[in-house]
Each structure stands twice: as structure tokens, then as C-alpha cells.
Amino acid sequence: MARIALGIRYDGSAYHGWQVQEALKTVQGEVEKALSAVANHPVFVTCAGRTDAGVHASAQVAHFDTTAYRSDHAWVFGANSNLPHDISILWAKAVEEDFHARYSAMARRYRYIVYNHEIRPAILRKAIGWHYRPLDEKRMQAGAQYLIGEHDFSSFQGAGCQSRTPVRKIFQIEIYRIRRMVVIEVQANAFLLHMVRNIAGVLIAIGSGEKHPDWAQTVLKAKDRRQGGVTVPPNGLYLVEVNYPPNFKLPRMPLGPFFLP
């Protein structure tokens, strides 16, 4: 039995999230069908971060076990020939059996991209979020500082989250502007359901002047989702990096999405 790690990129617009759900189109379901065709036996895939419906990934990492022998090249090109065009396998690598895409990960990084203009984006509407009021990224950065560190993030946890604990550790939050786009970049050890989208909702309210930067601290301390801001739409969210111990020697991919410089 061999264990294979994969790098995966996908546009999540047409999918009901990563995780397999009966009678629904999911990224995991499509990847497993494609790999099963290459392996000639059923393949079950485990990923680093189970993205929600409509959320994208430029650097998802997954693994599967197989009794089939294929070269790394064959796994990549064989799977891609069986996948829909909005999912791509970027790389494949044989790994030791102690590697686990989810539990071996040390950190994940997400980017939420907001098109900040009074007129909504027509062409990239499925690829970025939108806010029509001017956003002050310095105010957003000031609010974000209250969220860095290890905290109970119950106020940022979506309903139905199955995590055993709401405690997470945020290593870094960076807010920056690229022309008309404001990028909210968050790195943490792990994330709760809707956590990044709820953080983005709070920071956008701060950036638009609706709330003061210290409102982020008020929301955090409340430990009550009802005290938080709106949950921003999923289309602007990307899983852009998963970090692992260097001994696994996994390929490094550039942070995405590709349309950011």
C-alpha cells in the first residue's frame, strides 16, 4: 500500500464544498472519481482543509492510499484527464505512511479578496467579493490585531460547526490593497466553519467606518456569533497555502489566486 500526496487547485463556484455529500456535486467526489479511474480501484481522499460551498483553492493538499503503482506524472495527468476543467491536480508525490494531509499540517493560509468599488464586478463576480463603500485598510489592520493569538473564536464560528473546540491560534492577519482590490490574508493553525468569512465581515464593517477598530475585540470577547457581523459571500475566499514540516519535502506552490500580482 502506497500513500500519495496531491496539490489541488479548483474553482469552487459550481460545487457544494469539498466534502462528499450524497446526491450533490463536490470537489472531493470529482477528485475521487478521477483517481479511482487511474488506480483501477476505489480511492478515498483526505484533504488539509474542507472548503465550504463556493470557496476556491489555489493550493489545497490531500492524500490517498493505493495498491496501484503509478509514476507521479501518471497520477497528475491521468487524474486531470478525468477531471472537470475547474479542478486541476498540480503535483503528486509518494510520501511516508505517517503523512496526513490534515493532521500533519502546521498552518493554513486563506485570502479573502474584496473588489472595492461602487460598481459591482461583472466579469470576476464568481472569483471575488465586493463592497461598494470605500474601505480603509489601515483601520482594518488595526482591528485585526485584536484577533491575533490563541483565542476562543465562538463569535466567528458558523452554525453547524462540528469542531470539538472553538479555540484556534491565528499567527498572522495582513490587510493590503492592490488597486481596487482589498486582500484579507489570515494564517492560523486551523479554522472553524465560516471563520474567515466572519472575520472578513467584521473587518469590512471596520474598514467602511461603520464600526471602530476595537469592535473586533468586543466581538471576540462576546463568544457569541449573534454579536458578530455579517458572513461575507464565499466567492472571494481562497485556500492559498498549507504548511507542513520540512521532512515531508512537499512541493511549494506560489500563493494564489493567479490574478493577484
From Swiss-Prot:
Catalytic reaction list: uridine(38/39/40) in tRNA = pseudouridine(38/39/40) in tRNA
Enzyme class, broadest EC rank: isomerase
GO biological process, one term: tRNA pseudouridine synthesis
tRNA processing listed as a keyword: yes
Active site, renumbered: D52
Pfam families with a match to the protein in the record: PseudoU_synth_1
GO molecular function: RNA binding; tRNA pseudouridine(38-40) synthase activity
Keywords noted in UniProt: Isomerase, tRNA processing
CDD domains, alphabetized: PseudoU_synth_EcTruA
HAMAP family for this protein: TruA
UniProt function note: Formation of pseudouridine at positions 38, 39 and 40 in the anticodon stem and loop of transfer RNAs.
Family listed: Belongs to the tRNA pseudouridine synthase TruA family.
Name the UniProt record assigns to this protein: tRNA pseudouridine synthase A
Source organism (scientific name): Coxiella burnetii (strain Dugway 5J108-111)
Lineage: Bacteria, Pseudomonadati, Pseudomonadota, Gammaproteobacteria, Legionellales
